[in-house]
Every structure is written in C-alpha cells, then in structure tokens.
UniProtKB/Swiss-Prot annotation:
GO molecular function: protein kinase binding
Listed name of the protein: Leucine-rich repeat-containing protein 7
Listed Low complexity bias regions: 790-804, 859-871
Ranges of compositional bias, category Basic and acidic residues: 663-676, 872-882, 1243-1263
Tissue specificity remark: Brain-specific. Isoform 3 is ubiquitously expressed.
Domain annotation PDZ: ranges: 1445-1535
GO CC terms of this entry: adherens junction; axon initial segment; basolateral plasma membrane; cytosol; extracellular region; postsynaptic density; specific granule lumen
Length: 1537
C-alpha cells in the first residue's frame, strides 16, 4: 500500500496547486491483499499505462479493466486467476503481460490480437498447450513458460522470429518443433527438467544461441552437433545420463561454462582442451577414472570440480591452470597430488576431502593465495613444513568433526626421513572410509541413504543405564562393532560445519573422529558437550552448532554412541548423487548376512567395495553390516531397498536419538551392543552427511535383528534412524521433552529397567526385533517423556528444501505406514501365553503385514521385513503371513513373535492386562525402500520431476508438536506386542528422540509415558498431558498440561464446515497417500498401545480418538508440517475426546470391548500396513483443520519453477511455512477426498464398514468437531446405509482373512482361535443388530459397541478394513483378543481415542458377527473363500482419492476368470500406480465371472492363499491359470468417497 501511495503521491500532486488533474499512468497495488481489482483503477482507464497487482488474491479480471486501451504493462503474478478472459484482446497496446503463479489453464485464442506483446511471463500455471493464435504474436521477444504442463509446442512456433529468450523449464517436453530453426535471434533457451531423451535436432540450427540449459533430462549422449553452436557461452547438461561427450564439442569455441555434473561419464574427450575460453568446468558426480592431459590447455579455467569420481591421479598438466581459483577433487581415490599443483598459485579454495592421500608435496607451500584447504578423511600422517608459508590460510580441515577452522600445528622431525614436518593431534589420519564402506555397500539402500543424508544431523546415542552413562560419560569405548570407527582412533572432535560446500563423508569422518585419542570431554570442540554429555541425553539433543558429523562414540557401556552431528551443507546434488551411485553399486552387491560381531569385518570387506563407490559417499558400512548381520545377505540388499520402512528423513537437522533398550535387551547386550554399534554405525551412516537414504538404510538395519535384545537395540538404533527420518518428517518438538536421546535414558541395551519401564518381555523383544525388520520399525519412546521435544527443533530445523529436491520422489514412494507408538510393556506383557503373539503389527502393517496391505505402501518386498529379521526365512514368513493368516503361527510369520509368542502376545495383552506396564510409544514407519528408491532413481538420473511440488516434498516432514498421545501411546502398545517394545524402544530411543521430538505426538510426555515402559509414566500420562499450542507458523507457543481425561482443545476449533472446505480444496492427487508419500499419518505413526487396559484405557481412549485424528493428521502430515498436524490433531482430538470419553471412558468394557479394541489395534496394525482408516479420518481432520487454516488452491500449491520462483511464492506458499513444508492448509488441499468421507462418519466400523471404507469414521472425526451426538447419528446413518449395502457381506466381511490384518488375525488366530467363537458369542447381540436393518444394526452396534468399547460411537478414525482386525482375529483373540483387544483397543483408544475403538468394535462386531472370522484366522486363503467379497477394506495407503480397501472376492472360473492383469516384478508396470510393482487388474470382461466383483485398478494381494505382493508377472499368470474352478482373491481397491 505504501508503494501505491507513493506512486500516487508522486503522480498526483495536490490538485490545489495544479490547475489540472495529473495524468496517472502507473498504479501499483502489489501485496495489498486485494480480492478484486480496485474500482478506482477504472477512473484512469484512458491514461493508465502500467498496472501492478502482484501478490494479491484476485480471482478474476473485471471486464472494465480491458477498457484501459492505453495499458502497456499488466502485472498480475501470484494471484488466484483461473483463466484469462477473452476480452484481453481489447488491450491492443499491451506490451508486457505477467500472469505467473496463477491457475491459468490456457491462453485464449484471441490473445493474438495483442499484437504488441513483447514479453509474456506465464510460468507456474497449469497450461497444457499453447493456442495456435499464440504464434501470431510476432513481436514476442521473451517468453517464460516454466513449470507448466506443456507436452509439446505448436508446430508453427518458429513464427516467433523475434524471440530472444525462451524458458520452458519444468514441463513435459520430449521434442521441439522443427520450425524452431527460424528463431535466428534466440539467445537463451532453457529446456531443463523436461523429458528429452536426446538432444533435439533443431538445436544445432539455432546459430545465435548463447545459453542452453538441458539439465535434468534423460540425455545419454552429448552429440557432436552441439559443436555447431559457435556462439554458445553457457551449456548446462548436468543431471542427465550422458555416458559420452563427442569430440566435436570443441566446436563451441566461445564456451565459458560447461556443466556436466551428475552424469555417467567415464572419460572426457581430449578435445576439451580446445575450449580455450572455458572458465568453469564441472564434471563432478560422474565415473571418471582419469582426466585428459589436455586439461592443462584451459588456461582461463577458474573453477574446476571433479569431485565424486573415481580418479586415481591428477594429470601433471594441471599445473598449467594458472587462473584456477577453486579446485574440488573430493571423494576420489587420489593417493598423491602431482608436484605441479604448486604452480596453481591463484587457487584460494582447494578441497581434497575423502581421498587416500598419505602425504602432500612440499610445493603446496607455493600456493600463496590458498585460504581454505580441506584434507579431511585422508590418510595423512603429517603435513609438509612448507605449510608455514601459507600466510593467508584461514581454514584447514583435517577431520570432519573439527571444531575450529585452524588448529595449531607443531613442528616435528619425521621419524624416518628426519625431515621437519608439521603435525597435531589429528595425525595420523585414519581413513574413515574403508571399513565403513564395506558394510554400507551391502545393505546400503541408495534411497535410504539419500534420506539419511538429509538427516545427517541425527545423533543416535545408545545408553545403558543412566548410571552407566554417567559413569562412562567421559569414556569412549571402542567396540569391536565399532570397526568402522577404528577402535584405535581418537575420540571424536566435532568439526565445524563444513566449509561452504565441502561435504564430509559421514562415516569416514565419524570414524576418524572417533579415534583412539581421548576426546577432550570439556573440549569445546564437542559441541554436544563432552562425550559424557552423551549421557545427558537432553543436552545431546541440543542442536550441535558445529557441523556435526555422524560420529560413533563407543557407547559408554561398550555400546557405541553414534552421534551424527554432521550437517553437510552441500545439498543433495553432487554428494547425494554420488552417494546414490555408490549406494546403487553397493546395493547391487549382495548384502552379507553378517553378524553384528562380524559387521566390522563385513564392513571392511564391503567397505573396500564401497570405498570405491562410496568413497564419495561414505556410508556407514556398519549400518549395512548391521543390516546384513540381521538380515540375510541377498535379502538384505533387497531389504535395504525395502527399507522403505524407514520414514524418509526429511531434511531436518538430525536429532540426537537415544537408542534405548530394556535391560532384558541388555542381556544380549554384548551382541546387542555390537549390533548397536553396527546399528549406530549404521545410524551414523544413516545420519551421515550423505545419509538421507542412509537413514532409511539405517532404519532398515534397525529391522535387522541380532538377537531379540540385540534386535531391540539395533532396532533402537535403526529406529533411531527411523526416528531421525521420521523426526525429520516430524520436526515439531512433540514435547518439551528432549529427544529420547537427550533424555536420560541409557542405551537400550544398557538401559537399566526403570522402575517405571518394565523390560519388554524377551518375546516382545524378539517380536520387537521382528518389528524392526519391518519397515515400520517401531520406535519405542524411552520413558523419558520430556526429552524429545527439545531435539525436535533440530529435526525441524533440517531444511526441508534439502530434502525436497530429491525427496519428493522418495516421499511418493515412501509410505510411512502408521507408526504405532508401542507402549513399552513391562513385564506385565507376559499376558497369557495362550494369546497368540500378534504378528508384529508393525510387520503387518509395515511391510507385508497384511496381504491386504497396500503393497504400494510397502513397495519394498515383503521379504524385506523378514529379511531384516535375523532369519532369512523370516521374509518368507512374513510373506506367508501376508499371504496366509494360517502361516502366522503363534508368531512364526512374525519371527520375533514366534520366538516369544507368549511375550509378544503378552506384550499386546500385557498392555491390556497390565497397565502397570507402561507401554512404550513406538513409532513405526514403514517405507518401502522401493518407494524410496524411486527417489534415488530420480536422483541418479538427476531427474527430478517438477511435478513433485515442493509442498508435497515438504510434506515429507512432519512437524508434530506435543500432541498428547497417551491414547496413541496405548495404541502403540498394542503395536508393541508385535513389535518388540525393546525394538520399539530402541527405535523409539533412537527414534524416540526422533519420534518424540520429531513429530510423533506419541512423544507427548504422557504419550511417551504410555509408550515408555514406565508404569508410573503411564499413570502420569493418563493423568496429564502436555499439549502444545501452535501459532500460525505452527511453532509451539507453549505446552499446556492437560489431564488425560480432557484434552485441551486445539488452537483451532474443529469446524466441520471448515474441514469440509479443506477437504474440498484438497486435491485428491495431493491427498493420495502417495502424495503424502513419505509420511505415515501421524496417528499411525504414533500408535500407542494403551498402557494398560485398566489404568490408562480411559485416558488413552480419550486420547485415542485424538490419536485417531492424529492418524489422519499423520497422513496429512505427509503433506502438512508436523506442527500443523499436531494442531489439527489437537483440534480434532478434543472434540473427539468427548466421544472417546463416552466410549472410551469405560476402557474395559468387556471382552467385546477388548476385542473391539483388539480390532482397533489390528486396525491400527492395518493402518500401519498402510491402511489408514484412521488416517483417512485424520485427513479429514486435517481437512477440517485445514478449514481453520487458509487453504490455497491446488494451483497455488503447485511447485514453483525451480529457477524462477521460490518455493513459497506459489500458491500454498503463503500458507506454507518457508521451510517448504506444506502447511496444514496445503495438506488439506492434498488430503484425499477420502477425508470427505470422514465427514460423514466413521461408522464403517460396522461390517458394512468393513465392506465400505471405514472412511466414514472420518466423518466421525468431522463430527468430533460437531456434537458427539451428531457424529453418532451421522455415523449410524452412514453405517446403516453401508450395512444395507453390505449387510450380505458383513458376516463374511468379518473374515480375518478378509481383514487387512490378515496377518494379525493369523497371529491372533495362532494365539487363540477360540476368540473367534467367543467373540462371536459376545458379539452375538451385535450380530443380531447387524442382521437387522443396517440402520438398526448401526444403532445397535453403536450402542453395543459404545458399551463395549469406549468409542462406541464410530470414531472418526474408523478402523479401516485393515484397521479392524479380522473378525476371526478378534474372535480368535476372543479372550486373549479381548485382552489384547482390550489393551490394544485401549491403546488404540488412547491413540485413536475411544472413537477409534468404537469403530473397531463395530467393525469387529461385524466381523465377529460373521462366522467367517474363525476360518480366516486359520489362513488368509481361508478368509478369501468366505464371502464372495469380504470388504474388509482397510484404509489403503493411497490417500489420494479413496481409501484403499481390501476385499475378499470369490470368482468361479467360467471357463476362465474373466479379467486381465498387469504389473508384477518383471512386468511392464501398471497404469494405475506405476511405482507399485504389484499385480493389478487392468480389464474385466463385461459378462465374465469377475464382472461384478472386480474392476480395473484393483490390486491383487492374494489368490487362494498365494501372496501376489512381490510376484513375477509370469508367475502370477501361471498361478491364476493353474487354480481350479474357485479362486479366492484378496484385492485392494481405492474406494472413492
């Protein structure tokens, strides 16, 4: 406004003095929050020449505006225009038009009438094509169409002969029209981020071209024809797949900048020396083994970057580069430098990081202008004395964790040559790389790595008992596991943040840093404080000012403490690419199933390999080793890929993650320690600089189980990685609590059992370990409730943008299955052995948990989960479990469970049965590595789709603020039963810092308490919770202590209308879980088992509804920042609480109740599996909350052009925090329409619900915003309708097999099949209601369920088909399940608040009602046969349009099956979810046997008990053909609401 006034003031002097009115020619209304063009503009329509309306909210241009005939410049960028009116043709004098960052979908044909147009800026609009009339704008000189949806240009585009600048970045162009050769005046052409597979032929005919961008395409060759562009000055060919550069490139005589970064070059042509004017040459991140000698001819070269290659020597001619100022040769294999290097006297910055230098030439002292020299991660024993001549040297990096730029050097005599040399305590350097790399190469997952890299600031500490921590605080132990760290290496010194761009390889640095040398504990260098500081987990949580590198401190108790403090400044590009490359190479190698103890050796062996590749990307070999050791080699590799379980690590500063284990775990501690070391190393790898993917790798590793305890520890570590990932995902400080790592908790192995926290049963540990195998490694929050919050900021601080670049693809691929917070269950866990240990819920929902599970969500192979498990068979088991419930023996499918079926059961039940045992909140995130891998692929190909909007990417991080998650914690508990609390604990510790601090509401103190094994905490949790209130920026404004019973209402009121609005705004696409890709819904992410049925059930239940909401939030989280999610969740939760209270208050309603709760648990598991029934509601909640936030149009949310626009500027950017994390509103925009379903109520719990998505439960959530009664009514109504529709199937639906939790049900079945019957009997009355009219049924269910479960009403988070355990399971669980369910439901309630349970109950009841359930538990196959269709849909992981629901469909061959399939491992992919390698139905014969049962897009999860999740296409076809007449399919369908 001030600008406007200024201009008007300037142009309109007081009329008193002027006899006539001043001529107004310029009006500027920029940034005035206008919703329409001000009317006063029309007063000057005769004289107005320039009108600026930038950055307002104008949705349409009034007709009067086009009467301004004199208008020459019209600037309306960053508004809400959806179209350009045809009346624009009347602006015949218009010369400049700027409509960028709007929602304009096309130019009107008659824009051709604006003959004077010379500049058109229309970037960041969904323009799919240009009208023919556009080519008649013959005066056009500048055209900017970046970030549109153009797939082609008009054939006569060459008519625009006056074009000088043409920018078409970030479109979908594959070719250029041949007429473009007429653009003789074209000087700048930007074709970056398109889909060119080869250089367009027409390019070499545009002779006047001076600047050409072709980066981020799919070029494989740089043809010689480019040499015809004699005027070319700037050429960017980076991020393609170029393998060869033609000799004729030398024809570009004027070329000054040549960018070939991130390609696949193995050599450069000698003719490159003929580019005499070259000043910048970048060939980093390729596969060069040598440089041509002719490079010395580039006498004007000022910047030369050949980092991240495979160079073993530099040519001596490099001495001729007298103009060179910057030389980067990082991450190569140089054993020495040529003496001629001293002739490069103008070099000011030289980086030689991560090579194999053992000495430096004396001539280096001649480089008098050298100011920055990075020698970290080499093998130097000393420095030449000539270094004393470098008077301008300001920074000398000798290690990655160096705390000061310059460290004093002492003069010494060389022992052998007696020459004077310079040394200091950092010599001799220990190569970090060799050992570290080995392990990495095997289990290393590129995608995970990338994520981890982004996560590079994570710190994972494993502490034994606090006492031990305190005692050993100052001591650094070298563990054999620490091999990567070099036992003899000196203590770690924190190194300052890297110089501008130098990236330190995480491992090497860490290793080096962790050298024998004692670490000066008081040394300021240790930013975190002395290693002893490690003990102070909280302090550890504090962000490290220095660039912390992942360092592994031998943990005090012989555990390794891994601190990933390194912040690598370098963004994804080169390092990441290199890392990816290395990783890919590594991944290619089979992972060794190495023991943790062996991991060092493994690491070494792998390291060598890795070193080769990873030198540039040092991975924590340990990490791989860990994985390897836990997982079987071949599988391991895949597992790494599958590691998707690792949540993508947003690019947040790593948090300190405390990997805590119960004492029990410590029993295996030695092994565990090793494992931990490995894990830690893995973690460090995970946290390492380039560790974005690494983190996920680490997480994957976490899955690996060394021993149950080890696994736990490992899991803890991995989980910590997970947590880190997640934490980055959910940066928001959950509680005031410091990160778990910060917390006082001791390393899981070492952690003494706190009185509060009971050690998890070994079984649980085993289970936990199993859980770790799953992508969704549970994170068990250590008891320390308050610790996470502090570290959260670190996570949150991680720049989203960092991850956003490559992240999006990852996110898409990753689906974080709900991460339940498993309350660590104390000894109480040992509930009746009779109970079948539930399969790890994590497993279930994580990766392969349920055949119904969205495979896409867990693209990684089911094997992955099992692979991670100590037993290779595990994979198969899991698969089996997914395939057939029966395979789930009392735990076989879930190996760990199997180990301690009782325990796992007890874990689950113990939560129910013993509240004394506080549950540990564990977050389990499952990310399929494959999902992640796409990102890697993208990175590798250097191709980032611009379609990946930053928002979406941003979504990757969850910013979760302290949302009381007591309920969640409870939910976790149930999870815990599957996942070992220990494991969970480990992860939670490792991850806890993450989970807690990061974003998991479950990290709430109370939540944590639940999650933690502390009984007292549980109680405490039940009593009070801290709720954070967030400001508009979603920054926690403070925490409020809330009693468990009543939660503080979220800052925003639930506004059903608003929610609906939000949902409206949300684009389904955005919403799809894929869109949320990397992030599991918060609720799921934080599923908390209720600590104990009795104590916390009510509280938990109350919070459970919130939790459920949280779930949806989580999902939204993927899009929304954790804080926003938290806010939403809070908002939703409080409303839901009342219903929860109603239903939840009586947490222990009875067997039925429990069963329903079990159902809930299962549903949660299912959710974890990727069915987010709750999530959807959560989404809805999110939407509703979004309502509270300004919601931008999808278009607004569109990503900005990479170059031209800031991420924020576009659309949602306003609402979205700068971090690029999409705001709640943005998320809401992206929330799947499913969420709308949420509005109508979550009744789906009913069998009908089972059939239909429980999405209605979301409705309930919305209801949460409305009066509880309304919600119930709505839910009932919906349910009644569903019941009517699905009544026939309801009983059938109940089949466990049908339930997504098939695995779980199997587990339960294993535990006690009797439950089915019992349940059935218990549910009989409910059954009757089901039999009644649907509406009646729903009422009955509501009532009964209400009675039974605290959330009698359908909770906003209905149990997805997946969420709800199969009836069979429930019934099976019968008594146990009741207990289990009770506990789980309590947990669920706590997390979902009773409503969820209610939903579950209803669903369960429905399921129970159907007799099928019992069968189903026996085997999924069994369930399959049951009803023609078991709509046990569970929320699918896809959130986009609908909820993926799972159905059982029985087809009778006649003569064939009547449908066609596509997809599969080796198939050509499917048109529905290209990233999903599952088997999809592509065509259904209209009259065929499947015509009424299947529809295109259905994903086949099972057929007659055979899992189709990771199956070869041919095998699937053969199987289907080989079946007899009846084929029972378990399919997943995205139901649109």
């Amino acid at each position: 406004m001030t600008t406007k006034r200024k201009i008007i003031g300037r142009l309109v002097p007081c009329r008193c003095f002027r006899g006539e009115e001043e001529i107004i020619s310029v009006l500027d209304y920029s940034h005035c929050s206008l919703q329409q063009v001000p009317k006063e503009v029309f007063n000057f329509e005769r004289t107005l020449e320039e009108l600026y309306l930038d950055a307002n909210q104008i949705e349409e241009l009034p007709k009067q505006l086009f009467n301004c005939q004199a208008l020459r410049k019209l600037s309306i960028p960053d508004n809400d225009l959806s179209n350009l009116p045809t009346t624009i043709a009347s602006l015949v004098n218009l010369k400049e038009l700027d409509i960028s960052k709007n929602g304009v979908q096309e130019f009107p044909e008659n824009i051709k009438c604006c003959k004077c147009l010379t500049i058109i800026e229309a970037s960041v609009n969904p323009i799919s094509k240009l009208p023919d009339g556009f080519t008649q704008l013959l005066n056009l000189t500048q055209l900017y169409l970046n970030d549109a949806f153009l797939e082609f240009l008009p054939a006569n585009f060459g008519r625009l002969v006056k074009l000088r600048i043409l920018e078409l970045r970030e479109n979908h162009l594959k070719t250029l029209p041949k007429s473009m050769h007429k653009l003789a005046q074209l000087e700048r052409l930007d074709l970056g981020n398109n889909e060119f597979g080869e250089l367009p032929e027409v390019l070499d005919q545009i002779q006047n071209l001076r600047e050409l961008w072709m980066d981020n395409n799919a070029l494989q060759v740089l043809p010689g024809s480019i040499g015809k562009l004699k005027m070319l000055v700037y050429l960017d060919m980076s991020k393609n797949r170029i393998e060869t550069v033609d000799m004729d490139i030398s024809g570009c005589e004027a070329l000054e900048d040549l960018l070939l970064s991130s390609n696949m070059l193995q050599q450069l042509p000698d003719s490159i020396g003929l580019l005499k004017k070259l000043t910048t040459l970048k060939v980093d991140d390729n596969q060069l083994t040598m440089l041509p000698n002719t490079i010395g001819n580039l006498s004007l070269l000022e910047e030369f970057d050949c980092s991240c290659n495979e160079l073993e020597s530099l040519p001596s001619t490099i001495g001729y580069l007298h103009s060179l100022r910057t030389l980067a040769v990082d991450e190569n294999f140089l054993p020495e430098l040529p003496r001629e290097i001293g002739s490069c006297k103008n070099v000011t910055v030289m980086s030689l990081r991560s090579n194999k230098l053992e000495f430096l030439p004396e001539e280096i002292g001649q480089m008098q202008k050298l100011r920055v020299l990075n020698l970290s991660d080499n093998r130097l024993k000393n420095l030449p004395f000539s270094f004393t001549k470098l008077k301008e040297l300001a920074a000398l990096w000798l290690s990655d964790n160096q705390s000061k730029a310059l460290i004093p050097l002492q003069t010494e005599a060389h022992p052998e040559t007696k020459q004077r040399v310079l040394t200091n305590y950092m010599f001799p350097q220990q190569p970090r790389g060799d050992e570290d790399f080995q392990s990495d190469s095997d289990s290393f997952n590129p995608t995970l790595w990338e994520e981890q890299r982004q996560q590079r600031m994570t710190v994972a500490f494993e502490f034994e008992d606090k006492k031990e921590d305190d005692e050993n605080a100052g001591k650094v132990k070298d563990l054999s596991c620490q091999a990567p760290w070099e036992r003899g290496q000196r203590g770690i010194t924190l190194q300052p943040a890297r110089l501008s761009g130098d990236c330190c390889t995480p491992w090497a640095r860490c290793d080096q840093q962790i050298q024998d040398m004692p670490v000066p504990q008081n040394d300021p260098q240790l930013a975190w404080g002395c290693i002893s500081g490690l003990q102070q987990e909280r302090s550890m949580c504090t962000p490290l000012p220095v660039a912390a590198q992942s360092t592994t401190l031998p943990s005090l108790s012989g555990r390794q403490v891994e601190i990933n403090l390194k912040r690598y400044p370098t963004p994804y590009p080169e390092d990441l690419k290199n890392m990816v490359k290395s990783v890919q190479n590594l991944v290619g190698k089979p992972s060794h199933g190495v023991r943790v103890e062996n991991s060092n050796p493994t690491a070494n062996t792998e390291q060598t390999v890795k070193e080769k590749y990873e030198h540039k990307w040092p991975v924590a070999p340990k990490e791989i080793t860990v994985e390897d050791s836990f997982v079987h080699p071949a599988n391991e590799m895949r597992i790494g890929e599958l590691h998707p379980s690792l949540a993508e690590t947003p690019l947040y500063p790593p948090k300190l993650v405390l990997l805590g284990k119960d004492k029990k775990e410590s029993t295996d501690e030695s092994e565990v320690d090793k494992t931990h070391c490995l894990n830690n190393s893995v973690s460090s790898g995970t946290y390492s600089d380039y560790s974005p993917s690494q983190a996920s790798s680490g997480s994957s590793n976490t899955r690996v189980k060394v021993g149950s305890l080890q696994t736990t520890a490992k899991d803890a570590v991995h989980n910590s990685l997970w947590g880190n990932r997640i934490a980055p995902s959910f940066p928001q400080p959950l509680d005031s609590k410091p990160l778990l790592s910060q917390r006082e908790a001791v390393p899981p192995g070492n952690i003494p059992q706190r009185p509060d926290r009971l050690p998890m049963s070994d079984t649980f540990t085993d289970n936990w370990t199993d859980g770790s195998h799953y992508d969704n490694t549970g994170f068990v929050a250590e008891e320390t409730t308050a610790e996470n919050a502090n570290s959260n900021p670190l996570l949150s601080s991680k720049s989203r943008s960092t991850s956003s670049h490559g992240r999006r693809p990852l996110i898409r691929q990753d689906r974080i299955v709900g991460v339940p917070l498993e309350l660590e269950q104390s000894t109480h866990r040992h509930t009746p052995e009779t109970e079948v240990p539930p399969s790890n819920p994590w497993q279930n929902w994580t990766r392969t948990p349920s055949p119904f599970e969205d495979r896409t969500a867990f693209p990684s192979k089911l094997e992955t989960t099992p692979t991670t498990s100590p037993l290779p068979e595990r994979k198969e088991h899991i698969k089996e479990s997914t395939e057939i419930p029966s395979p789930f023996s009392p735990g076989v499918p879930w190996e760990y469970h199997d180990s301690n079926p009782n325990r796992s059961l007890s874990n689950v039940f113990s939560q129910i049965h013993c509240r004394p045992e506080s549950s540990k909140g564990v977050i389990s995130i499952s990310k399929s590595t494959e999902r992640l891998s796409p990102l890697m692929k993208d990175i590798k190909s250097n191709k980032f789709k611009k379609s990946q909007s930053i928002d979406e990417i941003d979504i990757g991080t969850y910013k979760v603020y302290n949302i009381p998650l007591e309920n969640y914690a409870s939910g976790s508990d149930h999870l815990g039963s599957h996942e070992r609390p220990d494991k969970m604990l480990g992860p939670e510790h490792g991850m806890s810092s993450m989970s807690r601090s990061q974003s998991v509401p479950m990290l709430d103190d109370e939540m944590l308490t639940y999650g933690s094994s502390k009984g007292p905490q549980q109680q405490k949790a039940s009593m009070t919770k801290k709720v954070y209130q967030f400001d508009q920026s979603f920054n926690p404004q403070g925490s409020v202590e809330v009693k468990a019973e009543k939660r503080i209402p979220p800052p925003f009121q639930h506004n059903p209308e608003y929610v609906q609005q939000a949902s409206k705004n949300i684009a389904k696409d955005l919403i799809s879980p894929r869109a949320y890709r990397g992030y599991p819904p918060m609720e799921q992410m934080f599923s908390f088992s209720q600590p104990s049925v009795n104590e916390d059930a009510v509280v938990n239940a109350q919070f459970a509804s919130q939790g459920a909401r949280a779930g949806f939030l989580r999902r939204a989280d993927s899009l929304v920042s954790a804080t926003e999610m938290a806010m939403f969740r809070r908002v939703n939760e409080p409303h839901e609480l009342p219903p929860t209270d109603r239903y939840g208050r009586p947490p222990y309603r009875g067997g039925l109740d429990r069963q329903s709760s079990v159902t809930v648990t299962e549903s949660q598991f299912l959710k974890r599996n990727g069915r987010y029934e709750d999530e959807h509601p959560s989404y809805q909640e999110v939407k509703a909350q979004a309502g509270s936030f300004p919601v931008k149009n999808l278009t607004q949310r569109r990503p900005l052009s990479a170059r031209s626009y800031s991420t924020e500027s576009y659309g949602a950017s306003q609402t979205r925090p700068v971090s690029a994390r999409p705001t709640m509103a943005a998320l809401l925009e992206k929330i799947p329409s499913d969420y709308n379903l949420g509005n109508y109520g979550d009744k789906p719990s009913d069998n009908s619900d089972l059939k239909t998505r429980p999405t209605p439960v979301k409705g309930e959530e919305s209801c949460g915003k409305m009066p509880a009664d309304w919600r119930q009514q709505l839910l009932r109504h919906i349910e009644a309708r569903r019941l009517d529709r699905n009544a026939a199937y309801k009983h059938n639906t109940v089949n466990l097999g049908m339930l997504p939790y098939g695995g779980i049900s199997a587990m339960h079945a294993g535990r006690s099949m009797t439950l089915n019957l019992q349940t059935k009997s218990k549910f009989d009355h409910q059954e009757l209601p089901l039999q009644k009219t649907p509406s009646q049924q729903s009422n009955i269910l509501d009532n009964g369920q209400e009675d039974v479960s605290p959330s009698g009403q359908w909770n906003p988070y209905p149990l997805g088909r997946r969420d709800v355990p199969p009836d069979t399971i429930t019934k099976k669980a019968g008594s146990h399940i009741q207990t289990l369910m009770g506990s789980q439901s309590l947990q669920h309630r706590s997390r979902e608040q009773q409503p969820y349970e209610g939903n579950i109950n209803k669903v369960t009841i429905q399921q129970f009602q159907s007799p099928l359930p019992i069968q189903i538990p026996s085997s999924q196959a069994t369930r399959g046969p049951q009803p023609g269709r078991c709509l046990i849909q569970t929320k699918g992981q896809r959130s986009m349009d609908g909820y993926p629901e799972q159905f059982c469909v029985r087809i009778e061959k006649n003569p064939g099956l009547g449908f066609s399939i596509s997809g599969g491992i080796s198939g050509q992919g499917n048109p529905f979810k290209p990233s999903d390698k599952g088997i999809f139905v592509t065509r259904v014969q209209p009259d065929g046997p499947a015509s009424n049962l299947l529809q295109p897009g259905d994903k086949i999860l099972q057929a007659n008990g055979h899992s189709f999740v990771h199956m070869e296409h041919e095998k699937a076809v053969l199987l289907l053909k080989s079946f007899q007449n009846t084929v029972d399919l378990v399919i997943q369908r995205e139901l649109t609401v």
